Amino acid sequence: MTRPDLNERILSLRKLRLAQCRTRTRRTIERRNGVRLEINGSWLVEFCSNDYLGLAQHFEIIAALQDAAARNGIGATASHLICGHHAIHKALEYELAEWLGYPRALLFGSGFTANLAVQQALLTKENDICVQDRLNHASLIDATRLAGCRLRRYPHLDVDGAAHQLKNAPEGAAMLATDGIFSMDGDIAPLRALSLVARTQQALMYVDDAHGIGVTGPQGRGCIAAAWLSVEEVPLQLVTLSKALGGYGAAVLGSATLIQHLAETARPYIYTTALPPAQAAAALTAIRIARRDEWRRQRLQELVERFRENSRRHGLEIMDSETPIQPLQCGDETTTMAMSAALEREGFLVNAIRPPTVPEGKSRLRVTLSALHTTEQIDTLVQALARSRDALATEAAPVKV
């Protein structure tokens, strides 16, 4: 018997990624000051983080984390069901449920883990089905595959497509899952229409609102609140503590029955050490600031509008997004990487997003905005984007003889 050599396979795949301009590297951040990062001794203005409200370095949140670490240590020491569920976890779950208008919340270490937990615990039969938007986050897609149920995907934002998939699978339990705000496109799911489809087809509606929480809706309560949907219309949702709230972790919110079922049966919850109490304390403080500081959302929206207006004025090919995620279409991987490198030379960090994260031929620069950015930084970035685009176009133009 001759098995495939895994090392040879890895080397072959690496060569392919190099040829396709799809290798990935990590950048080491030496220091951070708001939206400014020091990398290799140089300071760059970043337009690529998810710190939408500018809370990651907020002094009140840092103080809450330090105080909780001094009292409780740096780790929970066990899973929630053993002896890792601290009073601060309980307080955070209560605050989340009260803020978002759900009966209960359940904490997880990350949004990826939470999505795995939800589908593994609820979609337990082979003929169960999860219907998803084609551009959903990878964790939602992987969760369905790992759960062992059927996965059906509909064209992006296509409500009729979602209904069609559910109608064609009448047997088995069903879930309709979607991102609230799509992380690579920045657009918002048609939640009201999708929730109606879910109820009509007797499917459980599940919304991953990782990028909506804190950013949109009344008091920053996210996409579901912005669409004026109730718990009955969206029985289950996920929020993260790591984007607009600036920390780490996630939570799933739903009815007491659903949440208790997850706590008792979801393997990624049962067999994982609880979120560090200090992180929970930081998240609790971040939520209170996010609820209090409406000016952060107002400021963020003003910057989004300014970026879009300036980009249109310079003829930049921005996508249709009214959120802090503002992708700029570049087409092929080589062009996208070249534009990212050109921006870095001008003092900006904007990541190139390439397949398989986005579809073939749709590589882009994913510009993300923070309430901490200044109007000058926005304007200067747009000018740099236009210059890099024009420079690349000049290089690609045929030479006249």
From Swiss-Prot:
UniProt keyword Electron transport present: no
Single Gene Ontology MF annotation: pyridoxal phosphate binding
Domain of life, per lineage: Bacteria
Residues noted as binding pyridoxal 5'-phosphate in the record, renumbered to the chain: G111, F112, S183, H211, T240
Catalysed reaction equations from the record: 6-carboxyhexanoyl-[ACP] + L-alanine + H(+) = (8S)-8-amino-7-oxononanoate + holo-[ACP] + CO2
Record flagged with keyword Transferase: yes
Family matches, as PROSITE patterns: AA_TRANSFER_CLASS_2
Binding site for substrate: R24, H137, T357
Pathway noted in the entry: Cofactor biosynthesis; biotin biosynthesis
Role played: Catalyzes the decarboxylative condensation of pimeloyl-[acyl-carrier protein] and L-alanine to produce 8-amino-7-oxononanoate (AON), [acyl-carrier protein], and carbon dioxide.
NCBIfam families, alphabetized: bioF
Protein name: 8-amino-7-oxononanoate synthase
Organism, as annotated: Xylella fastidiosa (strain Temecula1 / ATCC 700964)
